[in-house]
């Protein structure tokens, strides 16, 4: 029996990593066979790609960035996600295909159809069952995200202009019109957000 594939999406600093950790611990405590992963960087190859993508010293073209994310995702699906789902595990992923549509498609202005087509080929039918989008004001999210870095400047993407991140946020609003998505107000306490996510996920697991 196939497992359950859940992804968390959102702009920088929206709290995805915090929420996915909280959900992972709660589901483990409930006795579910669950794994947690992220993009980029969910595999050994992905970790190397992540370094290239997020290093603020790297000047990278939009197409090169897009293809590196696609390569990371291709390896991620084959090496980790598909095998885990086929063995019945619950897979929690911090970012997946929708990040490329939002960031490289809408954010960078690449052809949306190309971004979707390449990524649909890459994931080979491995679609998330449920995607949570943590929605937050861009300025507030960037302030949070940059505050986590040693120099308070953030990684290569976090240093992008506010207008870039506004396009990304708007993209998530458009994507969230699909029934697979649940958009949540991320400007609340982590406990309140967690309760809402956990309730939705538990409902899927006990069907």
Curated annotation (Swiss-Prot):
The family this protein is said to belong to: Belongs to the thymidylate kinase family.
CDD domains: TMPK
Protein name: Thymidylate kinase
Domain of life: Bacteria
Organism taxonomic ancestry: Bacteria, Bacillati, Bacillota, Clostridia, Halanaerobiales
Enzyme class of the recorded protein, top EC level: transferase
Keywords for this protein: ATP-binding, Kinase, Nucleotide biosynthesis, Nucleotide-binding, Transferase
GO BP terms in the entry: dTDP biosynthetic process; dTTP biosynthetic process; dUDP biosynthetic process
InterPro entries, per the entry: P-loop_NTPase, Thymidylate_kin-like_dom, Thymidylate_kinase
